[in-house]
């Protein structure tokens, strides 16, 4: 047929590897509007999002602000691990605390505590409303609540809270559904609604701010408790078991095992041990570019795969090590294998430069894409803006760059514990009742973990990703640079998604399930483009022009 070629023919009858720009999709029949396109997808076996975008766990891309922004837009962020465990845990908790259903671990104080304690909580964590119980802990008898209105004009910060708290309270009584509690909160016109049991003991809290966020961000990715989804990266080092345990207890919805070459005994053993300790914890393995690599990780029990090796804009693995694969070819073959062996979701990681690349990655079988360079330079990315040759930019670097390896700090074995009433302690959700048995499962070192003991605990997450922690000479597999200011992800992600929706409409696929069905059935057609065809398909023959991403 002259109307293009199916993917099977393109990828299995040539010795060449293809990138996204080498391919173009053939149009289909349009019988629906662009607003009818649904991009809901899975990023692991059990984790669903409404936008197929995940931010990369890089130290110049994803910390809590980026993770919050991505989740509000319907995707998810993955907190990088080029930092101490305690700090990474705190980053995860900031995402989880940004939006809540029932707040099950609120900061709580006693009547004898002072106004200064409330100020410390507000300064450190941003919360200005604090329930007051007789014990200063969740589960104590509720006596009142202190809000910013109660203490705004007080000059004596040593004033006991018993003198300023509001004791005439509107409360919800357990058991209560979240919808009922939210309606009660609306009717009360209060900022917070404490939830109590029959003994008037505090069991939870809900916030009016969350009702506003629900209205403003209807696509937001949330867990069963209506908190934003967030992932966190861990390395394959043996002691990162403790990091993984701390992140799981902090509420991370998925752990991403961060390695440039995922088919290693270290990653296989780590995945098996994590699955033994936390059977319900979702784990994304990688990175992989071949079916053989994918098989190793799927057999180990991963719930999702990252695809890509050397295709990122700041990655030099293919040049330095001569190992990797063209990204479009890697995505097609790995996704095909994963689909046929357990239907494991795949994330295309690397090489994404525009919304068209996102569309092509999804069309080749990916369930979502992971973005680094496209999100770097946004307001939510870590780092400060500066001017380079008159252009406002932010630093962006590969995790294999020497700068990233040097930037890592010494890891701590575990984060500090947090008492529910202590304003100075790090916030965390309570550990589950099965914690002791899980900890013992984690502490049993596997043979390969013992053989890896020489991988010292002082190395950085970045160095561990490239197996370079204990090397006298570190070979960079990435570079450091800068990217232009892109504004906020609150505008960038909707622009990208709208472009993808138009692409879906053009080929006649309402959902990603429809798109993948067309791919498997051969109805989805592609052409391979020559260099001249690629130039023709972009802006050309103009004296000058201005390329704007969105209006």
Swiss-Prot record:
EC number: 1.1.1.205
Keywords: CBS domain, Cytoplasm, GMP biosynthesis, Metal-binding, NAD, Oxidoreductase, Potassium, Purine biosynthesis, Repeat
Bias-annotated ranges (Low complexity): 422-462
Cofactor: K(+)
InterPro entries: Aldolase_TIM, CBS_dom, CBS_dom_sf, IMP_DH, IMP_DH/GMP_Rdtase_CS, IMP_DH_GMPRt
Residues in CBS domain copies: 102-163, 165-221
EC top class named in words: oxidoreductase
Domain of life: Eukaryota
Region annotated Disordered, chain positions: 407-462
Pathway the protein takes part in: Purine metabolism; XMP biosynthesis via de novo pathway; XMP from IMP: step 1/1
Annotated positions binding NAD(+): 258-260, 308-310
One matching Pfam family: IMPDH
Protein residues bound to K(+): 310, 312, 315, 536-537
Regulation of this protein's activity per its record: Mycophenolic acid (MPA) is a non-competitive inhibitor that prevents formation of the closed enzyme conformation by binding to the same site as the amobile flap. In contrast, mizoribine monophosphate (MZP) is a competitive inhibitor that induces the closed conformation. MPA is a potent inhibitor of mammalian IMPDHs but a poor inhibitor of the bacterial enzymes. MZP is a more potent inhibitor of bacterial IMPDH. Potently inhibited by MPA and adenine dinucleotide analogs such as thiazole-4-carboxamide adenine dinucleotide (TAD).
Active site: 315, 465
Enzymatic reactions: IMP + NAD(+) + H2O = XMP + NADH + H(+)
UniProt: IMP binding residues: 313, 349-351, 372-373, 396-400, 477
Gene Ontology biological-process annotations: GMP biosynthetic process; GTP biosynthetic process
Gene Ontology MF, one: nucleotide binding
Family: Belongs to the IMPDH/GMPR family.
Complex and partners: Homotetramer.
Protein name from the UniProt record: Inosine-5'-monophosphate dehydrogenase
């Amino acid at each position: 047929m002259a109307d293009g070629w199916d993917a099977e023919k393109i990828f299995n009858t040539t010795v060449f590897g293809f990138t996204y720009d080498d391919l173009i999709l053939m149009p289909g029949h349009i019988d629906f509007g662009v607003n009818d396109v649904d991009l809901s997808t899975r990023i692991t076996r059990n984790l669903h999002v409404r936008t197929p975008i995940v931010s990369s766990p890089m130290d110049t891309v994803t910390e809590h602000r980026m993770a919050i922004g991505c989740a509000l837009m319907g995707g998810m962020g993955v907190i990088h691990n080029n930092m101490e465990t305690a700090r990474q845990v705190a980053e995860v908790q900031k995402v989880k605390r940004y939006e809540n259903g029932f707040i099950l671990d609120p900061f709580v104080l006693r009547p004898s505590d002072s106004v200064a304690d409330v100020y410390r909580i507000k300064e450190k964590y941003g919360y200005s409303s604090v329930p007051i119980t007789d014990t200063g802990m969740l589960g104590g008898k509720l006596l009142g609540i202190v809000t910013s209105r109660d203490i705004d004009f007080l000059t004596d910060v040593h004033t006991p809270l018993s003198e300023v708290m509001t004791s005439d309270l509107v409360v919800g009584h357990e058991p209560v559904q979240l919808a009922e509690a939210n309606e009660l909160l609306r009717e009360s016109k209060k900022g917070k609604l404490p939830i109590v049991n029959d003994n008037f003991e505090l069991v939870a809290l809900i916030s009016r701010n969350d009702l506003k966020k629900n209205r403003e961000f209807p696509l937001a990715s949330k867990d069963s408790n209506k908190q934003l989804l967030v992932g966190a990266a861990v390395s394959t080092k043996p002691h990162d078991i403790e990091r993984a345990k701390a992140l799981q207890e902090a509420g991370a919805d998925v752990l991403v095992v961060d390695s440039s070459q995922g088919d290693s005994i270290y990653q296989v053993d780590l995945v098996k041990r994590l699955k033994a300790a936390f059977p319900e914890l979702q784990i994304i393995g990688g990175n992989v570019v071949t079916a053989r690599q994918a098989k190793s990780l799927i057999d180990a029990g991963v719930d999702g795969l990252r695809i890509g090796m050397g295709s990122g804009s700041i990655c030099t693995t293919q040049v330095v090590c001569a190992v990797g694969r063209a990204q479009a070819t890697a995505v097609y073959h790995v996704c095909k294998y994963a689909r046929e062996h357990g239907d494991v979701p795949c994330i295309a990681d690397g090489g994404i430069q525009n919304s068209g690349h996102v569309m092509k990655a999804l069309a080749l079988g990916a369930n979502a894409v992971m973005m680094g360079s496209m999100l770097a330079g946004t307001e939510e990315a870590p780092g400060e803006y500066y001017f380079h040759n008159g252009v406002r930019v932010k630093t962006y670097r590969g995790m294999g760059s020497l700068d990233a390896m040097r930037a890592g700090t010494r890891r701590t074995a575990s984060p500090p514990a947090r008492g529910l009433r202590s304003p100075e302690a790090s916030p965390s959700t309570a550990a589950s009742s099965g914690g002791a048995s899980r900890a013992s499962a984690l502490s049993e070192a596997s043979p390969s973990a013992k053989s890896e003991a020489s991988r010292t605990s002082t190395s950085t997450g970045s160095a561990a990703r490239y197996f370079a922690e204990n090397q006298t000479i570190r070979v960079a597999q990435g570079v450091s640079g800068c990217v232009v200011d892109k504004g906020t992800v609150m505008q960038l992600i909707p622009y990208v998604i709208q472009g993808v929706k138009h692409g879906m409409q053009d080929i006649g696929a309402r959902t990603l399930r429809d798109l993948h069905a067309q791919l498997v059935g051969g109805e989805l057609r592609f052409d391979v483009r020559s260099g001249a065809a690629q130039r023709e398909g972009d802006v050309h023959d103009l004296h000058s022009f201005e390329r704007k991403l969105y209006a």
